[in-house]
């Protein structure tokens, strides 16, 4: 086992919890397209990629469109809620979450896995838990 440290890992560590919670709150719970776009510009690299179970979404505008469509599809009181603190190391962070409305708060559950580059999300994998 090597004891050498990659110089890229010596930079200040990413705040995985802050970044991944901000993504959930300010992107995937934000109904205002302008505010959502501003959050994406702050939280994501210039050319991010998001991987969903059946789609690959490329670019900030496309990610914003997916978030907006989800919110529109499930109604005004649908929201994503973190289940624990975001954790990570070596440029990869995770955040467990559930989503739903007040009467059915766990309509869907999953985990976001993000590759962090220079303190921003470069790639995001949305892993959904099986239902039933």
Predicted regions located by residue number:
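C-terminal and inter-domain tail/linker signature
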Residues: 1-132
């Amino acid at each position: 086992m090597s004891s050498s440290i990659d110089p890229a890992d010596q930079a200040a560590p990413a705040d995985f919890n802050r970044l991944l919670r901000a993504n959930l709150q300010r992107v995937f719970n934000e109904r205002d397209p302008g505010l959502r776009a501003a959050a994406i510009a702050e939280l994501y690299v210039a050319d991010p990629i998001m991987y969903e179970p059946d789609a690959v979404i490329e670019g900030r505008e496309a990610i914003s469109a997916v978030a907006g469509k989800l919110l529109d599809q499930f109604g005004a009181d649908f929201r994503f809620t973190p289940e624990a603190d975001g954790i990570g190391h070596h440029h990869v962070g995770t955040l467990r979450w559930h989503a739903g409305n007040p009467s059915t708060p766990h309509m869907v559950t999953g985990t976001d896995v993000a590759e962090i580059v220079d303190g921003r999300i470069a790639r995001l994998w949305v892993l959904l838990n099986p239902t039933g």
